[in-house]
Amino acid sequence: MEFDYIIIGAGSAGNVLATRLTEDSDVTVLLLEAGGPDYRFDFRTQMPAALAYPLQGKRYNWAYETEPEPYMNNRRMECGRGKGLGGSSLINGMCYIRGNAMDLDNWAQQPGLERWTYLDCLPYYRKSETRDIGANDYHGGDGPVSITTCKPGNNPLFAAMIEAGVQAGYPRTDDLNGYQQEGFGPMDRFVTPKGRRSSTARGYLDTAKQRPNLKIITHATTDRILFENKRAVGVAYLHGASNTPQEVHARREVLLCAGAIASPQILQRSGVGNAELLKQFDIPVVHDLPGVGENLQDHLEMYLQYECKEPVSLYPALKWWNQPKIGAEWLFNGTGIGASNHFEGGGFIRSREEFAWPNIQYHFLPVAINYNGSNAVEAHGFQCHVGSMRSPSRGHVRIKSRDPHQHPAILFNYMSHEQDWQEFRDAIRITRQIINQPALDKFRGREISPGIDCQTDEQLDEFVRNHAETAYHPCGTCKMGSDEMAVVDDEGRVHGLEGLRVVDASIMPLIITGNLNATTIMIGEKIADNIRGRTPLPRSTASYFVAGDRPVRGEPLRP
């Protein structure tokens, strides 16, 4: 079989490319996905409130584990990644957060990335989005991905937690993806008007899969990329349970969109990466590229949990006898508790003056439970997810064998810098000040976790070591740039090779301030225009907030 383009990975970026490239009817595209379909009747992936379920199994989750993390009491930590049409947009928390404008302006200051400023990228965020309250300078109204905004009548804890953040002296913002990210406000979410998860399989592939010039093969595990000299010419993949590779060929390009864990792994198996590593596994070196699999970054977060004095939390919804009614309302009406991810309030703040833009993120949740659905507190409660945004810690992804079914060695090196510890100590102490504000007086019960006895730097550090978890935002392992550790250029083209691009979160040179999915989709949209030889969308002229010399916070209502 031969196609113009072969896309490896039907995830947040791969589905964007498959859809945009097949808009040109004379172009043929093959989309290979190692997982299966996104079954529309499976509530585990389609119901927003069920977001913890896919992380508990392996049907939709690669369920990677890290090597023992040396600064986290040698814990092996979860690294869930999506498997199936939609990729990680099929199993993520559905928070529609783009990051801060300064993240992209910061990328664009690096040599070779001048066309990645916020104003260059904003048109591509808008192109991908249909926001339920309509378009404006920051938001789209006719894109493939449905975005739902918060509505009146949602859980009263959201408004109370946002108000508490403002009472603690921080700004209020009405749109975390608009003029000003900094502050506390409502969070948009990847949910359709009918209350379904808005993955890229639903938003993009539902349109594209009707086209005769797109072929999708699921249960297709990529073994390696095929090369002739320095040119990528095809892909060898394993279909279903077969161990016999099938080869397909690309007339124009191979587009690697397998994500921050699998993309470097596939490159390494294919002979592209650090030559010393490849030689350990007798892999013929196609191109010695030392940055492949390096520069791994993530967001680490922890939960501060509180009992709730008013019976308004989601605790009753965790009981099996209440779930049939919730499920029926969601299934037939697309409304009710099932139709939300329940991350409807949050914020971004600067913990210290030295940060030019926010370095701490909050998600508020009106129940006390682990992200993966474990360890639910048997009482009405609420929690703040809080974590640092741009850790200086760096890790790596490295193959352990040539076997495409064997997971790679993943090490994030979480908390390897003093800055990490300072940010988390600050975050816990600031969160306690926020929770102590008058807006939460009628809701706030005792602190369940970490517990009021946890006060000294040493006690806080030990809590973080034992309890902090991934926010599931790995990136950076095939970074864009022009330095010796860069893997791709500003259009995703792999340095030193022809006919091969990487287009996914692995090309982010620096992690962004917030959840990754919206920006990964934007990357797909932007590079799709490069691949098609189209003139980039005109730069936006929208204004955006820069803190400058403004203080980090004002006077709290209650110290």
Swiss-Prot record:
Pathway: Amine and polyamine biosynthesis; betaine biosynthesis via choline pathway; betaine aldehyde from choline (cytochrome c reductase route): step 1/1. The lineage of its organism: Bacteria, Pseudomonadati, Pseudomonadota, Gammaproteobacteria, Enterobacterales. Its cofactor is FAD. The active site is at H473. Keywords: FAD, Flavoprotein, NAD, Oxidoreductase. FAD binds at residues 4-33. GO terms for biological process: glycine betaine biosynthetic process from choline. GO terms for cellular component: membrane. This is Oxygen-dependent choline dehydrogenase. Belongs to the GMC oxidoreductase family. InterPro entries: BetA (IPR011533), FAD/NAD-bd_sf (IPR036188), GMC_OxRdtase (IPR012132), GMC_OxRdtase_N (IPR000172), GMC_OxRtase_C (IPR007867). The keyword NAD applies. Its EC number is 1.1.99.1, 1.2.1.8. The keyword Cytoplasm does not apply. Involved in the biosynthesis of the osmoprotectant glycine betaine. Catalyzes the oxidation of choline to betaine aldehyde and betaine aldehyde to glycine betaine at the same rate.
